[in-house]
């Protein structure tokens, strides 16, 4: 069994045909984590005892013919998603010793399908960043080049799937945090429509943007995970009441003949790497040869997406993170002589540089005298961006675009340049602003052998359209999934 090319669908066949047991499969992944994760550093914690127990329970169900598609499948969870009785650190000193008293709804749904959870993966602190360098505990490396970043903030999840240290993973996407690392690590990452997956148990960064999404090796594997975790949840007020008439995994079949794709001209301007652009146009040629129609269109408001996103998300973060004060829970500073000193010192020592930067930006934009000048304008831009996409979807089935303007950069390259780091999300943040579904999958490799990602974005609740488009392209893409040489 070549674990480096194994997919969820293939593992399901092996398990159901009794060619391997759930316990053997789980131990294979745990052994690989023990051997290789010292190089990649994708995991913050490995839940070995829990995984082995879950594998035993899964095998019992398989033996009785009661397995779901995810029964016995080893997965990982980003460490800002809660699992009862395990640490949820958000890669922050502030929550270094926090043990979650409850389990996120999305994880509960995986438990209900008897998936096996191998551990919690690394991220940028509180999911704020695009390189996973902002973690308080370790820097995750890109499996394709250990001197480069895996992307972020779900860099640990993308790297562990790319390195075959799990068959799939749950990440969170606030401004591209599932899709951008998936692009950098050569795997598939999917952000669902806002509200399709419950946010209950996801530690909040920016509540009107945050969304849990799957990362896996194939489009179909992502669809299988989404089938498990989606659905209405009364514990989340923003959860959609949406009745799905068929599974997402069933939508990966069928061709795209006659599909109309729109390509925003604003994503083809200065700043787009030449090799990424070349790969994009080769992908367009491939889609056209499959019977699809591709047309460039203009959406001028997209040039304002990055500043609007960082203003709004930072404002929400400054509110959400105000709860961490060293009193009820979280890091508490020593030798404080007053209550005010306790709060100030605890937050100063508990939060990292990037988190502090965004709290300051958010607090500033919400302050009296600046609210109208900055935050209110950003809200207006949100409406304009949503309207722009709505208009585009009257003409096109799917919007097509690069996932990132460049391939994975060197560790430390952008550490002292917040603007350069923010611009890595230039093609992804508008999707979160509008609450749309989007999927990134590999479409090529640059001259250094680094993966390039292509994104398909759909209308609200248009997951089936983007799964169909992505799966059709994936089936024709000659290179498909490359195995990183680690």
Curated annotation (Swiss-Prot):
The active site is at residues 78, 153, 177. Its EC number is 6.3.5.7. Belongs to the amidase family. GatA subfamily. This is Glutamyl-tRNA(Gln) amidotransferase subunit A. Gene3D superfamilies: Amidase signature (AS) domain. It catalyses: L-glutamyl-tRNA(Gln) + L-glutamine + ATP + H2O = L-glutaminyl-tRNA(Gln) + L-glutamate + ADP + phosphate + H(+). GO terms for biological process: translation. One of its GO terms (cellular component) is glutamyl-tRNA(Gln) amidotransferase complex. The gene is gatA. GO terms for molecular function: ATP binding; glutaminyl-tRNA synthase (glutamine-hydrolyzing) activity. Keywords: ATP-binding, Ligase, Nucleotide-binding, Protein biosynthesis. Pfam families: Amidase (PF01425). Heterotrimer of A, B and C subunits. The keyword Endoplasmic reticulum does not apply. Allows the formation of correctly charged Gln-tRNA(Gln) through the transamidation of misacylated Glu-tRNA(Gln) in organisms which lack glutaminyl-tRNA synthetase. The reaction takes place in the presence of glutamine and ATP through an activated gamma-phospho-Glu-tRNA(Gln). The keyword Ligase applies. It comes from Ruminiclostridium cellulolyticum (strain ATCC 35319 / DSM 5812 / JCM 6584 / H10). The lineage of its organism: Bacteria, Bacillati, Bacillota, Clostridia, Eubacteriales.
